[in-house]
């Protein structure tokens, strides 16, 4: 297995080429329990779930033919959730409600050792260090031709919330008012360390150096999330008798995405501390300009206020089921979470907060069903930009937010043939096309993916207790990129999946 990351250099995308093992393995177990009890005044429902995840990821982290550094990350993760919802049994026609409590707990034991190899030692450690040592002093060298930087973590996360929604029917209006009070706690215990032996060219023996970066961090967030919405039934005349309805709606709500810790940056932190420790032995500076502390591992919650207006027209007549909807949205965000990469030859990536951002756009959907025929289509345009974002080096205000497509288009059509035979019961054929608009990959807007189309088709044949299906994706074999990142100062793109055909069988007893 591996990761299809292509080096981008001098305006050219090079073929996927790296020399160390890259693979991913996962074991996941999920289970849940649902219960419901109805009394004289309340209906109570409860949902409990549990998830166990164990995975292992091997990574050639420089993604080049050089032997620079590799990583093996393993996780043991345990998640428990509990939600209880209360609904009144008896209520007036004009009012209804639901209230609930939610609790969530997650424990994650993670180990992510980074192994520095010969090319990585020479370029990232010795190369940078010797660049700041006068030649007459001598040259720095290491006894090891490879060594690990171990990083062990324990993450605890909990979330408790209480929420309520009330629904008011006033003539043609349906009004909703609600809130959610959310409290989250995040804890991280970390222990990163490395042991090496170094010397200057004039020294006869190597000197041991042990570097440790250990401690714990915690964060707590309390959020009040209100919500208001209104739906107006604008059906007029004989529309209801003709099986038609027309509704308009508007809503405003506040949401948030929780903060957390950047575990991927710890090898960079320890590498800088290690270089600083060696140089201090000789009374010199390390020359590092991107030295980080534990504070750099934190990022804040992202909070947004979402405004939306729209309408929906529906028709149910003579076997036809037709729905057409359109909406416009305007979202204001504070502390927008974005992925950034350390300057220079850093090996990790981290989540950071931009100042403010805004997104606005339009969306439309269509769905038609008639006998065995079905047609679906959706389209959207989005303009997502930073309003205030300065990373200390550049001002990116008014630039496009990376990874956000400027437009999307999807359409599919198919027909289901019903035979009712003893052997073949039905067959369904569907074709679809997708267009993804321009995507900017970096905050400066210098790298982008131009719009591209993909096409697909699938066939499903139903037998008693068994379905056979075959699916073709990206039938035109379009070439496009789906992800961008940087490592050791190099830029990489992840290529999209090529033309492929999948066949399978599903069984039901």
Each language-model region and where it sits:
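Solvent-exposed loop segments that connect transmembrane elements
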Residues: 1-15, 61-70, 113-150, 187-219, ...
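Outer-membrane beta-barrel domain signature, strongest for Gram-negative TonB-dependent receptors
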Residues: 1-98, 104-106
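Residues on the lipid-exposed face of transmembrane beta-strands in outer-membrane beta-barrel proteins
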Residues: 31-37, 82-88, 162-168, 220, ...
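Membrane-embedded beta-barrel scaffold of Gram-negative outer-membrane proteins
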Residues: 34-39, 43-49, 54-59, 238-240, ...
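Surface-exposed extracellular loop regions of Gram-negative outer-membrane beta-barrel proteins
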Residues: 39-87, 153-217, 221-234, 368-381
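Transmembrane beta-barrel strands of outer-membrane/channel proteins
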Residues: 46-50, 99-105, 177-183, 248-254, ...
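Gram-negative outer-membrane beta-barrel transporters
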Residues: 92-96, 169-175, 183, 319-335, ...
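C-terminal beta-signal and adjacent terminal beta-strands/loops
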Residues: 244-245, 256, 371, 422, ...
């Amino acid at each position: 297995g591996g990761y299809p990351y292509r080096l981008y250099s001098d305006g050219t995308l090079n073929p996927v080429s790296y020399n160390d093992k890259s693979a991913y393995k996962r074991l996941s177990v999920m289970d849940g329990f649902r219960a419901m009890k109805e009394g004289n005044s309340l209906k109570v429902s409860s949902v409990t779930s549990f998830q166990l995840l164990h995975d292992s990821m091997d990574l050639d982290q420089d993604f080049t033919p050089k032997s620079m550094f590799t990583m093996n990350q393993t996780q043991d993760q345990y998640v428990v959730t509990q939600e209880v919802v209360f609904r009144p049994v008896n209520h007036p026609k004009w009012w209804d409600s639901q209230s609930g409590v939610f609790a969530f707990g997650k424990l994650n034991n993670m180990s992510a050792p980074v192994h520095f190899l010969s090319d990585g030692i020479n370029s990232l450690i010795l190369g940078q260090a010797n660049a700041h040592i006068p030649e007459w002093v001598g040259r720095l060298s290491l006894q090891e031709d490879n060594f690990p930087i171990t990083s062990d973590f324990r993450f605890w996360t909990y979330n408790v919330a209480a929420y309520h929604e009330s629904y008011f029917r006033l003539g043609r209006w349906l009004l909703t008012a609600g809130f959610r009070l959310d409290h989250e706690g995040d804890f991280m215990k970390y222990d990163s360390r490395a042991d090496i032996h170094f010397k200057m060219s004039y020294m006869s023996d190597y000197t041991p150096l042990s570097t440790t970066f250990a401690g714990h961090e915690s964060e707590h967030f309390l959020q009040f999330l209100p919500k208001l919405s209104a739906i107006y039934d604008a059906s007029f005349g004989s529309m209801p008798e003709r099986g038609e309805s027309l509704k308009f709606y508007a809503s405003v709500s506040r949401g948030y995405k929780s903060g957390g810790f950047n575990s991927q940056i710890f090898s960079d932190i320890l590498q800088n501390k290690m270089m600083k420790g060696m140089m201090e032995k000789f009374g010199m500076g390390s020359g590092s300009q991107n030295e980080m502390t534990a504070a750099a591992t934190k990022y804040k919650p992202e909070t947004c206020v979402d405004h939306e207006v729209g309408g929906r027209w529906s028709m149910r007549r003579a076997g036809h089921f037709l729905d057409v909807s359109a909406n416009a949205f305007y979202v204001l965000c504070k502390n927008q979470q974005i992925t950034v990469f350390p300057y220079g030859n850093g090996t990790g990536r981290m989540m950071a907060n931009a100042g403010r951002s805004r997104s606005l756009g339009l969306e439309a959907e269509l769905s038609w069903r008639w006998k065995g025929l079905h047609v679906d289509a959706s389209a959207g345009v989005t303009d997502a930009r930073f309003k205030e974002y300065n990373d200390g080096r550049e001002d990116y205000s008014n630039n496009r937010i990376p990874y956000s497509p400027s437009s999307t288009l999807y359409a599919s059509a198919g027909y289901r043939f019903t035979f009712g035979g003893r052997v073949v019961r039905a067959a369904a054929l569907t074709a679809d096309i997708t267009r993804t608009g321009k995507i900017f990959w970096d905050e400066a807007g210098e790298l982008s993916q131009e719009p591209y189309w993909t096409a697909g088709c699938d066939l499903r044949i139903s037998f008693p207790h068994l379905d056979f299906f075959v699916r073709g994706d990206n039938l035109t074999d379009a070439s496009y990129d789906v992800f961008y990142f940087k490592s050791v100062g190099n830029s990489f793109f992840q290529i999209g999946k090529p033309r492929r055909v999948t066949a399978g069988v599903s069984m039901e007893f």
